[in-house]
């Protein structure tokens, strides 16, 4: 049995074997990326768990506007090589959501670590904000991204609390540790004889909103009480 914690890893494993059971998690679009035939009936040797649906980018935009209502232009950072659908999975709903509220939307792709700093610096203008896509590459380089956003005083929202633990402003997304537990349960079912082809791909059931009040203060932002009341955790 093989476990894949990201879209690139799942893609590699699916290409390498059609017989060994594969359980993936932290994957965005398993149908679009060709890992399974459908969510309800994977039909192959792989199954697992979606981390977030594409529409989540609209939610990130809404939350960023709540904490930083002055923002008029928002960029979304991702690596096309590791993001689901090369980034299009989240980009399409992000662009639509931005248009609906009259904001300028910008794609901010990065291909290497060395590109992160200039891409973030390019967004460091008054009334700009940043969304970091749910993607293995930004997660792996979260310290650099968070540090640069703070340096440029750029309001940013992230997909996982790990970014906020590192000093990021706020995050909203599924709980990674819950995905690990659910993947372990699927592994147990497969070891007991069930087939991956018949185990449906499941969506997240737990989401969390985490806000770093210290970072908000450093950015000169006042977090609305309505947002504080909805937070699962406040970091002070």
Question: Positions of the model-derived regions?
Answer:
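Short hydrophobic alpha-helices and adjacent helix-cap/hinge residues
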Residues: 1-236
């Amino acid at each position: 049995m093989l476990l894949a914690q990201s879209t690139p890893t799942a893609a590699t494993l699916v290409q390498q074997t059609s017989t060994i059971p594969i359980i993936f998690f932290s994957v965005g679009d398993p149908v679009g990326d060709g890992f399974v035939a459908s969510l309800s009936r994977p039909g192959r040797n792989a199954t697992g768990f979606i981390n977030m649906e594409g529409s989540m980018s609209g939610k990130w935009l809404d939350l960023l506007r709540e904490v930083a209502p002055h923002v008029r232009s928002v960029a979304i950072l991702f690596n096309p090589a590791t993001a689901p659908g090369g980034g299009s999975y989240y980009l399409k709903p992000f662009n639509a959501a931005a248009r609906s509220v009259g904001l300028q939307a910008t794609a901010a792709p990065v291909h290497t670590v060395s590109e992160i700093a200039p891409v973030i610096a390019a967004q460091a203008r008054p009334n700009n904000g940043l969304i970091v896509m749910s993607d293995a590459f930004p997660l792996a380089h979260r310290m650099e991204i968070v540090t640069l956003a703070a340096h440029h005083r750029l309001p940013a929202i992230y997909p996982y609390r790990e970014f906020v633990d590192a000093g990021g402003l706020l995050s909203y997304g599924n709980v990674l540790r819950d995905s690990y537990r659910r993947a372990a349960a699927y592994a147990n079912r497969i070891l007991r004889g069930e087939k991956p082809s018949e185990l449906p791909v499941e969506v997240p059931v737990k989401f969390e909103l985490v806000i770093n009040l210290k970072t908000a203060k450093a950015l000169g932002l006042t977090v609305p009480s309505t947002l504080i009341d909805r937070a699962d955790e406040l970091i002070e």
